[in-house]
């Protein structure tokens, strides 16, 4: 089966946004996972920033991965993907000018869409890891992203954290981002349908949710009715791969089965703990 062109996959993603339906993403962290996801019928995949950091660096989601490293992984996937790939481009790897560079590089990598978030990254001294930048700065970064895009079919999605804001603040932000001309709004931290409905009535473009398999947000028809077109429910496939690797190697060494689950294994074998210590010691960052 021939691999579709980047332009075709971007058009496919646009069709998903315009379909009136809600789709779940596959966690596509390397070329094989992307091809498996397409063969199993997934309509869209996502390369998560946290997953890329673990896969490339064995590092936690502390904005340690560089644009070049992330783009290299996206390029490997984009070279053979048979479904549209969303790239979690974090904060665009810096200020508005860095965002422009991010757009250029990820567009060349072949992604169908990418998200740019308003989190203050990398975390600053004395700040929380979930702090957000001022809305004016975020608007400037989104305008820069749209300016840098060459293929107008590639979708640019603005992301914010509704769990760190009041409902009124969230509405104010998404309205400001929508006015810039982005192709969608991505939100993390939506608690339930009441929370979603209060915000979604102010959004006239497609919505993407990072829901982490929230049991309060599992009614796909109701999600679609509220404008939600894409839902990210975590990266179970990636963590299952970690667990499978551990179990295979453990059995080859004749070691008895342990009690660690996939999440605990990723913590044990990543550099999470030392980075937490360093962040608290040198930057006074609070999670």
From Swiss-Prot:
Function: Catalyzes the decarboxylation of oxaloacetate into pyruvate. Seems to play a role in maintaining cellular concentrations of bicarbonate and pyruvate.
UniProt superkingdom: Bacteria
This enzyme's EC code(s): 4.1.1.112
Name of the featured protein: Oxaloacetate decarboxylase
Cofactor note text: Binds 1 Mg(2+) ion per subunit.
BP GO terms, sorted: oxaloacetate metabolic process; propionate catabolic process, 2-methylcitrate cycle; pyruvate biosynthetic process
Cofactor: Mg(2+)
One Gene Ontology term of the molecular function aspect: magnesium ion binding
Species of origin: Marinomonas sp. (strain MWYL1)
Binding-site residues, Mg(2+): 88
């Amino acid at each position: 089966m021939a691999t579709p062109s980047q332009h075709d996959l971007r058009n496919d993603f646009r069709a998903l946004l315009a379909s009136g339906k809600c789709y779940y993403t596959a966690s596509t962290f390397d070329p094989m996972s992307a091809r498996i996801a397409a063969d199993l019928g997934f309509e869209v995949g996502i390369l998560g920033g946290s997953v890329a950091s673990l896969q490339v660096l064995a590092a936690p989601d502390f904005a340690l991965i560089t644009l070049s490293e992330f783009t290299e992984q996206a390029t490997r996937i984009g070279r053979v993907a048979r479904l549209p790939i969303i790239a979690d481009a974090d904060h665009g790897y810096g200020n508005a000018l860095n965002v422009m560079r991010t757009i250029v590089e990820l567009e060349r990598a072949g992604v169908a869409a990418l998200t740019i978030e308003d989190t203050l990254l990398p975390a600053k001294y004395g700040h929380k890891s979930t702090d957000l930048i001022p809305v004016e700065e975020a608007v400037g970064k989104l305008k820069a992203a749209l300016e840098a895009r060459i293929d107008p079919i590639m979708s640019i999605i603005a992301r914010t954290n509704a769990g760190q804001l009041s409902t009124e603040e969230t509405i104010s932000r998404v309205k400001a981002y929508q006015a810039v001309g982005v192709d969608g709004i991505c939100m993390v931290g939506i608690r339930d349908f009441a929370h979603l409905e209060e915000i979604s009535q102010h959004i006239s473009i497609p919505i993407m949710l990072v829901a982490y398999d929230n049991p309060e947000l599992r009614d796909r028809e109701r999600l679609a009715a509220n404008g939600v077109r894409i839902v990210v429910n975590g990266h179970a496939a990636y963590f299952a791969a970690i667990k499978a690797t551990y179990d295979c190697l453990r059995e080859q060494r004749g070691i008895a089965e342990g009690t660690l689950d996939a999440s605990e294994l990723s913590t044990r074998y990543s550099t999470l703990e030392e980075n937490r210590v360093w962040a608290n010691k040198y930057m006074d960052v609070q999670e």
